[in-house]
Regions:
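Loop/helix-junction capping segments adjacent to catalytic residues or to phosphate/diphosphate-binding pockets
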Residues: 21, 99, 130
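Acetyl-CoA-dependent GNAT
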Residues: 9-88, 93-94, 106-108, 112, ...
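Actinobacteria-biased recognition of intrinsically disordered, low-complexity terminal regions
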Residues: 1-5
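Conserved GNAT acetyl-CoA-binding A-motif
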Residues: 106, 112-125
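Short coil/turn segments at alpha/beta junctions that flank glycine-rich nucleotide-binding fingerprints
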Residues: 83, 99, 115-119
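Residues forming the Rossmann-fold NAD(P)(H) cofactor-binding site
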Residues: 99, 103, 107
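Active-site acidic-Proline motif in GNAT/NAT acetyltransferases
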Residues: 93-95, 99, 127
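C-terminal "cap" of GNAT-fold acetyltransferases
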Residues: 7-8, 26, 119-122, 126-139, ...
Length: 165
């Protein structure tokens, strides 16, 4: 994937290995924020796919957002082989919030999913993240019943993708 420049911004999106140093830095910042915001804390070892191994080609993808070369956001696409996948680990650094970056990351992961033949995306989140829930609802995600046994999420969404994203 070629870097995608942001309009009126220096933030670029690029695919990355989730095990790369920049990706690990974003993921650790994400985990630290969840630990602060969740009443019960957060331990990535208790979540599904703690090492993000399924967020790699050919079934998945991991996207980093960089400003001046530094990571400021990320999102993962966890493919299951077939037309269904999960969006995981959406995070934007506090200094980069309020600029539409989370929306851009979600658009990028949806486009990638379509390129991989994925037609239905699911995601889970926690009610302690109302800004994420608002983003999902405003971009066409529909709340669905629980679809996994991960201990942290309590809100679940699904979106059917169409070729004209």
């Amino acid at each position: 994937m070629e870097p995608i420049p942001a309009s009126r911004s220096t933030i670029l999106l690029e695919t990355a290995d989730p095990a790369s140093e920049a990706a690990r830095a974003c993921l650790q910042a994400y985990y630290d924020e969840l630990a602060r915001r969740f009443e019960s804390g957060f331990d990535v070892a208790l979540s599904r796919d703690p090492d993000a191994a399924d967020m790699r080609p050919p079934r998945g993808s991991f996207v980093l957002a960089r400003r001046d070369g530094l990571p400021v956001g990320c999102v993962g696409l966890k493919g299951h082989g077939g037309e269904l996948a999960e969006v995981k680990r959406l995070w934007v650094a506090p200094a980069a919030r309020g600029q539409g970056l989370a929306r851009r990351l979600m658009q990028c992961v949806e486009q990638t999913a379509l390129q991989l033949g994925i037609r239905v995306l699911r995601l889970d989140t926690n009610s302690s993240l109302p800004e994420a829930i608002g983003l999902y609802r405003s971009t066409g995600w529909v709340e669905i019943p629980r679809f996994n046994d991960d201990p942290y999420p309590d809100v679940f969404f699904e979106k059917t993708l169409h070729d004209a994203l």
